[in-house]
């Protein structure tokens, strides 16, 4: 029996795939748990349409990420922080501070979770921070931490 998986099913496939399973397995396990539905002509057509829409959205998201990566190339963000002796900061500079500085200085809105900062910055200087804009696209943001 051909079924369309509504969720990932270990050993069978991922969400949206059409798989061939035993009729008893489908009726007694997959259907009651909402893991799959029978693959009728109407549902197959709807699945094809849904996959086309998802592919278009994914392509658009990737194009936007590439454009954002191009905008971030060559950008140096200056983050000002209070300092003590020897260039040590009072507190630290984290990804939230960097995202806010990007927004205020360059009008680039970037979610703080996309900035991959291993640990908060605690000294003055130039740093390179990776930004994961898309699963396939990563950009580098140069950050200059300066004293106030």
From Swiss-Prot:
Keywords: Ribonucleoprotein, Ribosomal protein, RNA-binding, rRNA-binding. Belongs to the bacterial ribosomal protein bL9 family. GO terms for cellular component: ribonucleoprotein complex; ribosome. The lineage of its organism: Bacteria, Bacillati, Bacillota, Clostridia, Eubacteriales. SUPFAM superfamilies: L9 N-domain-like, Ribosomal protein L9 C-domain. The keyword Repeat does not apply. Binds to the 23S rRNA. GO terms for molecular function: rRNA binding; structural constituent of ribosome. This is Large ribosomal subunit protein bL9. One of its GO terms (biological process) is translation.
């Amino acid at each position: 029996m051909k079924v369309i998986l509504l969720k990932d099913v270990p050993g069978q496939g991922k969400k949206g795939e059409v798989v061939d399973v035993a009729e008893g397995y489908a009726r007694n396990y997959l259907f009651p748990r909402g893991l799959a539905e029978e693959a009728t002509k109407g549902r197959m057509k709807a699945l094809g349409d849904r996959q086309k829409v998802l592919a278009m959205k994914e392509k658009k998201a990737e194009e936007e990420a590439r454009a954002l990566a191009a905008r971030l190339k060559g950008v140096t963000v200056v983050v000002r922080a209070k300092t003590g002796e020897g260039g040590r900061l009072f507190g630290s500079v984290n990804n939230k501070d960097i995202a806010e500085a990007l927004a205020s200085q360059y009008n680039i809105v970037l979610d703080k979770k996309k900035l991959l900062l291993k640990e908060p910055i605690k000294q003055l200087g130039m740093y390179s921070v990776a930004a994961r804009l898309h699963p396939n696209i990563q950009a580098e943001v140069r950050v200059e931490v300066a004293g106030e």
